[in-house]
Structure formats: structure tokens, C-alpha cells
């Protein structure tokens, strides 16, 4: 079933599990005013606990993370191990509740757009079917160009409403490294998708003020445009 567009939402995906989606999402949340945050599905500890420490969230644990499984595996496999299924209707209900309470909602995915959410759907399918404007976080390292092209190709094939790409520095980089590994002009030329932010390296990802400064320097407000 295809749902109506959700103009107040942003889905944050990435090229893989270590792209830095959680940090980028937290930084965007800290600079977006009144905002709800949802980790769509989590397998193993990590992201939801980070959000609870960094963000002053006025929402229930179920709204923050409607689908949680213990084993750090792909969600359908983690659910199978517990004798459960991934119930996306439950996630949709949590998202609807957040939309009713907040003018903006950030939804973080698990892994990349090609990562499985259920036995039938990938993250890209969720974004396409729920019509979620999507940002894809690409870590600035060797291989970034190919990762960006691959993620955009999958998004287009499935029908994901792409908002743009975010280049994320996971370590201190020189200007030469940035240009060599993730040249903005070439990536935009190959993908036809704008790079809406270049997120700088954050030395202390557990310091909200550092995250705020990084988001402001990257002009992350543009991520909501479109």
C-alpha cells in the first residue's frame, strides 16, 4: 500500500552501517527546533541509547525506537532468532504519533538503502512506499564516489524521493583528501543529486555543543529544503 506524502519528515540513510548516520541525525535534531526522532528498527544496542543521552527527547521509548531486536544482525534475521517478525505497521503508528506532536520528524534507517528491513522490503522500499524525503550520508573516504553512485542508482530504481547527499568526515582530513576522495562536482555530475551538506569531523560526538557547531558550519538547515 502506498501512503500519502510526508512533507515534514526526513529519512536519514547512508552508504553502509558505518557512514555516520546517527551522529548526523543527532546534529540535525539539535539544530532543527521542535523535532521528533525515530530509529526505525534497531538490532543490538547503540543508536537509541546514544539519542537518549545526547537529545532532550520528549517522547516515549516506543516512539524513539518502535522495532528493537537483541541480536546485532539484519533486522529480519534478528527477528527470526527471537521468533518474531518485523512489524512495519507498528513503526508507521509510531511515526504517525510523532507527526501529530512535532512539526518535524527525523527517521534514521539501519545500514544503507539496500539493507533489508523485512524479508520483502529494503530501507529503500520503506522510503519509496511511505514517500519519505531521504538524505543519504556518504563517508568521505576512498570509495565515496562509487558508494554515492550506487546508492542513488538504487534509490532511483525503487522510487525513493531523494532530498540530497551529505558528505560526512569521520576523521580529520586535509583539503586534498576531501577533494581526492569526495569531489563535490564529480559526485553531483554522476548522480544528478545535490550535495546538501558537508558535515565536518567532530572530535567529541558525545558533546551536544560540538554537534551543534558542526551542523551550523555545514549549514544543515538546507537539508529541510526542497
Question: Which residue stretches match the model-derived regions?
Answer:
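N-terminal phosphate/diphosphate-binding loop that engages ATP/GTP or pyrophosphate donors
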Residues: 3-7, 23-85, 89, 94-97
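C-terminal binding/interaction regions
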Residues: 184-218
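Conserved catalytic-core segment of NTP-binding enzymes
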Residues: 43, 110-198
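Glycine-rich phosphate-binding P-loop
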Residues: 11-25
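Short, low-complexity, intrinsically disordered N-terminal peptides in bacterial proteins
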Residues: 1-10, 209-226
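Switch II (G3) loop of P-loop NTPases
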Residues: 91, 95-119
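Short glycine/proline-enriched coil/turn segments at helix->beta-strand junctions
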Residues: 31-36, 100-103, 131-132, 191-193
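General beta-strand structural signal in soluble alpha/beta enzymes
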Residues: 36-39, 62-65, 105-109, 136, ...
Amino acid at each position: 500500500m502506498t501512503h500519502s506524502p510526508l512533507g515534514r519528515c526526513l529519512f536519514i540513510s547512508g552508504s553502509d552501517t558505518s557512514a555516520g548516520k546517527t551522529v548526523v541525525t543527532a546534529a540535525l535534531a539539535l539544530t532543527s527546533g521542535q523535532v521528533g526522532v525515530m530509529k526505525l528498527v534497531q538490532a543490538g544496542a547503540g543508536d537509541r541509547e546514544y539519542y537518549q543521552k545526547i537529545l532532550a527527547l520528549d517522547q516515549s521509548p516506543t516512539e524513539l525506537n518502535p522495532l528493537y531486536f537483541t541480536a546485532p544482525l539484519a533486522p529480519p534475521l534478528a527477528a527470526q532468532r527471537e521468533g518474531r517478525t518485523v512489524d512495519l505497521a507498528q513503526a508507521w503508528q509510531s511515526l504517525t504519533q510523532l507527526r501529530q506532536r512535532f512539526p518535524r520528524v527525523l527517521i534514521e534507517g539501519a545500514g544503507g538503502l539496500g539493507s533489508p528491513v523485512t524479508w520483502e522490503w529494503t530501507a529503500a522500499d520503506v522510503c519509496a512506499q511511505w514517500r519519505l524525503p531521504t538524505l543519504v550520508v556518504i563517508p568521505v573516504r576512498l570509495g565515496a564516489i562509487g558508494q554515492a553512485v550506487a546508492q542513488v542508482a538504487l534509490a532511483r530504481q525503487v522510487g525513493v524521493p531523494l532530498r540530497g547527499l551529505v558528505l560526512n568526515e569521520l576523521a580529520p582530513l586535509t583539503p586534498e583528501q576531501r577533494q581526492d576522495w569526495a569531489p563535490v562536482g564529480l559526485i553531483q555530475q554522476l548522480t544528478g543529486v545535490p550535495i546538501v551538506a558537508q558535515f565536518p569531523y567532530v572530535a567529541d560526538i558525545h558533546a551536544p555543543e560540538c554537534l551543534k557547531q558542526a551542523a551550523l558550519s555545514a549549514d544543515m538547515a538546507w537539508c529541510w529544503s526542497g
